Regions:
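Acidic, Ser/Thr- and proline-rich intrinsically disordered linker/docking segments
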Residues: 98-157
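Phosphoinositide-binding peripheral membrane targeting modules
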Residues: 61-110
Length: 157
């Protein structure tokens, strides 16, 4: 009985996670959702599905699926809640203290530093972390004036 219950819960969790990820994939290209979140679609230079965690002080990281939106002057992380994009983080480039690229095996993580907060993020492709796109976010930020700095140890799983 317990094995059946645990198996059912694991299956349900997997189905919910896959469903949320598909919803994020659709939200990435939805101009109307982006407009209602306060970003003009024409201003979005890059829109990608991602996972991120915003860590303050020594709190444990809590990753969430999100839409990464980059404009000329800022970056935005939006979660998808009840069919709407909700702002989890908005940072102007000039308010960033630095950015780092952390590697673990074949995957990369962008770490963005702003005051006492560190944001760790990965860009996703259709199946897993897209290291090339994650690294291109890092390069874009440094090319646009965000200072490079040493990364913290790997954040998250």
């Amino acid at each position: 009985m317990r094995v059946a219950l645990v198996s059912a819960l694991c299956l349900l969790t997997g189905v919910c996670a896959a469903s949320n990820y598909r919803d994020i994939q659709r939200a990435v290209s939805d101009d109307q959702l982006l407009q209602s979140a306060g970003v003009t679609p024409a201003d979005a230079q890059l829109r990608k599905p991602c996972s991120a965690a915003v860590v303050e002080s020594d709190d444990p990281p809590e990753f969430f699926d999100c839409v990464y939106v980059q404009t000329e002057k800022d970056l935005n992380l939006f979660s998808l809640e009840d069919g709407y994009l909700m702002s989890e983080l908005q940072l102007k480039l000039h308010n960033m203290d630095g950015v780092a690229l952390q590697h673990m095996g074949r995957v990369s993580q962008v770490q963005i530093f702003s005051h006492d907060r560190v944001t760790a993020l990965y860009i996703h492709d259709k199946s897993w972390i897209d290291t090339a796109q994650t690294e291109s976010v890092y390069r874009w930020l440094t090319d646009h004036g965000v200072p490079a700095r040493e990364p913290r140890s790997w954040i998250g799983p």
